[in-house]
Swiss-Prot record:
Keywords attached to this entry: Dioxygenase, Iron, Metal-binding, Oxidoreductase, Thioether bond, Virulence
Listed SUPFAM superfamilies: RmlC-like cupins
Protein's recorded name: Cysteine dioxygenase
Organism, scientific name: Arthroderma benhamiae
Entry EC no(s): 1.13.11.20
Post-translational modification as stated in the protein's UniProt record: The thioether cross-link between Cys-113 and Tyr-183 plays a structural role through stabilizing the Fe(2+) ion, and prevents the production of highly damaging free hydroxyl radicals by holding the oxygen radical via hydroxyl hydrogen.
Length: 219
């Protein structure tokens, strides 16, 4: 697809301006930031995760509005492209999933994730947490799949550590999938997250979840 490029873009960073004249995607970016603005993220009493979901559900995907952020890399399963930091309260990312690729099974570093499909479809596998007593005793504790869901263009999903672990994959062997993710607080970017082995249940921590691009500019 023409808006997926494995190269450095010459686009200028987004500079906040008056909402008037912005397209629907960048209006969504502003609205998400406004909802999170007075708080420290979705854990705060004055923010309802449903408000985030409703805002994302109200946006109809238009690739001309977000394509500048959709940078891909064929050497990776997917790329994490930063769009906005929500006044330091969150990370809003466009993820580009290569055909047939998937994420590892992972947690969310005690943060909340709201995800919208911008293009294509993604498959989510959810898992129970492994039994910590077995892990501490050096025993294998294979992860149990609790739910499988196909998410299609414009659908929205919510995930947090309270719901378990998950893995996201692009089931299409020929086409990219693209999704918009809001993480709040932005713990994974600052402190990393844990990846899990499906057969043993054992985990290892990665120190930081890095970005492939920042506001349309490849890093």
């Amino acid at each position: 697809m023409p808006f997926i490029e494995n190269q450095t873009t010459t686009a200028e960073p987004i500079v906040p301006v008056d909402v008037k004249g912005k397209d629907a995607f960048h209006k969504l970016v502003d609205d998400l930031s406004a909802v999170l603005g007075p708080s420290s993220g979705l854990d705060s009493d004055d923010v309802d995760p449903m408000d985030i979901q409703k805002l994302m559900e109200g946006y109809v995907s238009n690739h001309e509005e977000w394509q500048r952020y959709a940078l891909a890399d064929e050497s990776r399963a997917y790329t994490r492209n930063l769009v906005d930091e929500g006044n330091g309260k969150s990370n809003l990312l466009v993820l580009v999933w290569n055909p047939g690729k998937s994420s590892p099974i992972h947690d969310h570093a005690n943060a909340h994730c709201v995800m919208k499909i911008l293009h294509g479809s993604l498959k989510e596998h959810r898992y129970d947490w492994p039994e910590q007593d077995k892990i501490n005793n050096g025993e294998a504790c294979p992860l149990t799949v609790t739910k499988e869901t196909i998410l299609r263009e414009n659908e929205v999903a919510y995930m947090s550590d309270k719901l378990g672990l998950h893995k996201i994959s692009n089931p299409d062997p020929n086409d990219f999938a693209i999704s918009l993710h809001l993480y709040t607080p932005p713990n994974a970017a600052h402190f990393g997250c844990s990846l899990f082995d499906e057969k043993t249940g054992k985990s290892h921590h990665i120190k930081q979840c890095t970005f492939f691009s920042n506001r349309g500019l490849k890093l």
